[in-house]
């Protein structure tokens, strides 16, 4: 038992967790206010897939908690200026109601007061920053992101940036390859070598290019979100998990997914990684990167 009578991750009586014997941290979840969440669901319904989990934030947290997930890293993101501060406040409130939630902040690059928003958030309880190149229509090496990279290096907190080209979905209203790619991130990191960066989805479909960067940029990491469970017709070489277990985090995109919450967890388990490697991917790397609030 934990302080206050809360159960440890393996003691919940919900659905069996795909990995019952070790701590699981989902390093990629989205917990948005209902109005924004509904708009996101409509977008996915029109352009991608039908989201399976459509209840509110607290129900989403409960689903993961009762399944055995010990911590979940909340990654808010905005599509236009003027929304970040309120969304950050919402995310922090969710984390205060649900101690399993590790709050990250967001900012719209270049917006008025953006640097102040970052400083307020990262000097406080927020454990990282979420940027989405497709949604925000901004490439990693765009100068408007320089304050984000600087803040990451200064506060030693990661930036989770979706900057792999896929999904190249016309619903974004642009050619995603114009704002993404390993080379664009490389240019940003050459300017800001102290920034800590997590690229979701193993950087698909430029996974080999992002993997090649791991040796050169020690602060670069990848996550597994939606690319180890064979949902898409194409997926990256999952043996990357064997080659770099210390640089990859487990994540899901929950609740914005078309299948059971543990679909990818079970797929990862079937890889039969060495126990130490599996532990690093499922929790160790996330605990190290997101700091004491994730412990």
Regions found by a protein language model. Name each.
Residues 35-40, 85-87, 117, 171-174, ...:
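Short aromatic-enriched loop/helix-cap "lid" or pocket-rim segments at secondary-structure transitions
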Residues 59-63, 87-94, 117-121, 144-148, ...:
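A general structural detector for well-ordered alpha-helical segments in enzyme core domains, enriched
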Residues 127-128, 142-249:
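Catalytic pocket-lining loop regions of alpha/beta-barrel enzymes
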Residues 32-35, 79-82, 110-113, 165-169, ...:
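Active-site environment of divalent metal-dependent phosphoester hydrolases
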Residues 66-70, 98-100, 188-196:
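A structural motif corresponding to the C-terminal end of an alpha-helix
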Residues 70-71, 79-168, 220:
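Active-site gating/metal-coordination segments in enzymes
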Residues 2-30, 36-71, 244-249, 258-295:
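Mid-to-C-terminal alpha-helical segments outside catalytic/metal-binding sites
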Residues 24-27, 75, 104-105, 130, ...:
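Active-site neighborhood of phospho(di)ester-bond hydrolases with catalytic His/Asp-centered motifs
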């Amino acid at each position: 038992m934990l302080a206050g009578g809360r159960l440890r991750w393996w003691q919940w009586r919900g659905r069996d967790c795909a990995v019952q014997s070790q701590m699981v941290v989902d390093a990629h979840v989205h917990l948005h206010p209902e109005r924004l969440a509904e708009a996101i669901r409509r977008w996915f319904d029109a352009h991608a897939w039908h989201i399976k989990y459509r209840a509110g934030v607290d129900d989403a947290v409960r689903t993961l908690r009762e399944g055995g997930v010990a911590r979940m890293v909340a990654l808010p993101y905005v599509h236009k200026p003027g929304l970040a501060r309120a969304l950050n406040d919402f995310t922090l409130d969710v984390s205060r109601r649900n101690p399993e939630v590790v709050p990250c902040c967001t900012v719209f690059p270049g917006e008025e007061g953006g640097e102040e928003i970052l400083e307020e958030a990262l000097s406080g309880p927020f454990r990282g920053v979420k940027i989405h190149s497709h949604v925000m229509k901004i490439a990693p090496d765009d100068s408007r992101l320089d304050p984000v990279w600087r803040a990451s290096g200064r506060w030693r907190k990661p930036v989770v940036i979706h900057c792999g080209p896929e999904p190249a979905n016309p619903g974004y209203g642009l050619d995603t390859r114009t704002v993404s790619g390993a080379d664009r991130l490389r240019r940003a990191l050459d300017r800001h070598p102290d920034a800590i960066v997590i690229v979701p989805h193993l950087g698909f479909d430029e996974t080999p290019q992002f993997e090649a960067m791991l040796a050169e940029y020690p602060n670069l990491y990848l996550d597994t979100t939606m690319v180890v469970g064979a949902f898409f017709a194409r997926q990256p070489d999952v043996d990357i998990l064997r080659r770099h277990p210390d640089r990859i985090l487990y994540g899901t995109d929950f609740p914005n997914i078309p299948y059971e919450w543990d679909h990818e967890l079970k797929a990862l388990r079937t890889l039969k990684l060495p126990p130490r490697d599996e532990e690093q991917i499922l929790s160790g790397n996330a605990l190290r990167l997101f700091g004491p609030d994730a412990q």
